[in-house]
Amino acid sequence: MHNRKGVKVLTLDDFDLDSKTVFLRMDMNCPIDPETGEILGTKRIEEAIVTLESLKDAKVVIASHQGRVGNNEYKGMNKHAEVLEKLMGREIKYVEDTIGESAQNAIKNLQKGEILLLDNLRLCAEENYEFTPENAAKTIMVSRLSKLFDICVLDSFPSAHRSHPSIVGFAQKLPSCAGRIVEREVRNLDEMMTVAKAPHVIILGGSKVPDRLEAIKLLIQNGRADHVLLTGLIGNVFMRAQARIKSPLGIKNEDEVVAKAHSLIGDYPDVFATPVDIAIDRDGERVEMDVREISKGDKIFDLGPKTVEYYSKLISGAGTVFISGPAGFFEKEDFKYGTSEMLNAVANSMATTIVSGGHLTTALKQQGLADKINHISTAGGALVLYLTGEKLPMIKSLEDAAEKHRAK
């Protein structure tokens, strides 16, 4: 496999995998119902199957994370094992450990053709921090586990923009290649970007604001964003930067984040579109209002109909549309409207379309719109950054691993 710059990356087809013990970094991070703790969408788990089938003669150890420390999606991986077992119709071994003695013994005892899923990688403190590849290789996680494996397969494209030990560390120590998901994503995205037409409309939502701000700037600078339509928490940040929301949003480093949004608006005043009306939750009921009517303490849960109409017109005139992140609290029935209507507008446009992120792919499936989209990716932030032309840490690790392999 070659990336868009012609650099060779090894794939599963470059290795003899028979009876090899494989470290398989997947991304099974799924949307979780905040009230029940149940998995809402299994798309990322389903996608893992094509790679697992290619590894049918190996001893496979799946490593993934779920949520972030401190949020309500931070869970163990036992339910993921149950879902995968049901999807594949076969036993999936599970160990409630990541790098300890139980995990190590489970890996050592694995037989040819068996699959083992480790617990949430972020239970290991090191996995919550970014490292250079060289330092990642020195972490306890990589030092302890790498000696148990023959090959590292990196297939967690949604996490490819992170420099975590499991993503960049093992490739320093082991022969490494891309899995089928990464192979497909890179090939399809590179093909699409060669034919993408202006105007480019980017619709951004969700809650991962700091990552988005830098990506927005790069997308604009690289000619990938003629219009940026803002929804979700990032939309609130930009409305706060415009002084259209008076009350603090209660997010980490809010002053710094809002200042960056304000700077972007100043540098690119004709690019950004923010909501004109919204919906809040008032005593358990959906209440729609003009943005100017927002009171202190009101929490924005969705877009209003005027914003949907405004954004839909911009989408209908686009040559290329990219949407990432829900427009609101779509898990709640009363606040699905904005996300649903944005996806309808994208699906019914004549543009080349890309839908990105675990939450949106779940919503897209629920609405039966998947067949109308050119490319669907469970990656969110990684895909946004890839479209800017920036080198993703995972891809760089795979390139370096390929160079080492060829040098032997």
What are these regions (language model features)?
Residues 1-408:
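Active-site loop-to-helix "anion-binding N-cap" substructures in soluble metabolic enzymes
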